[in-house]
């Protein structure tokens, strides 16, 4: 069985590399880690994955991105992969966006950046979400 995907989306390449590094360090043995630099690029990736009948376990999206913000992206992502766990990342105490996301996107979690150390602030959250996803996951 093919490994499911984790997708992370952030327009800041340095931040994106850091997220990818943290994800690979912990999850590469069980998941395929993908990254995208915009909501538009990420939606193309999600569509390709769906067309191949592969699964996305988790989507991490930055809130503040040009063209399409994190909430707008996650709304569209949910249409393509409704079962994926959705996490909104923000560097700001952007409670308005968080409330909108929780209501509109059925957001699973809201994470503040930076989350160093990831062992304390990132992995426990993602472990719980991935456990939930696996509990509901029914491979075709």
Tell what function each PLM region has.
Residues 7, 50-60:
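Active-site beta3 strand of CheY-like receiver
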Residues 10, 61-62, 90:
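Active-site residues of response regulator receiver
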Residues 13-37:
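Two-component/phosphorelay signaling modules centered on CheY-like receiver
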Residues 20, 35-48, 70:
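Helix N-cap/capping motif at the beta->alpha junctions
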Residues 44-48, 71-85, 100:
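Short amphipathic alpha-helix used as the core "switch/output" element in two-component signaling
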Residues 65:
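Receiver (REC) domain active-site loop signature in two-component systems and cognate sites
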Residues 68, 72, 79, 92-112, ...:
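Alpha4 helix (beta4-alpha4-beta5 surface) of REC/receiver domains from two-component response regulators
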Residues 119-140:
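CheY-like receiver
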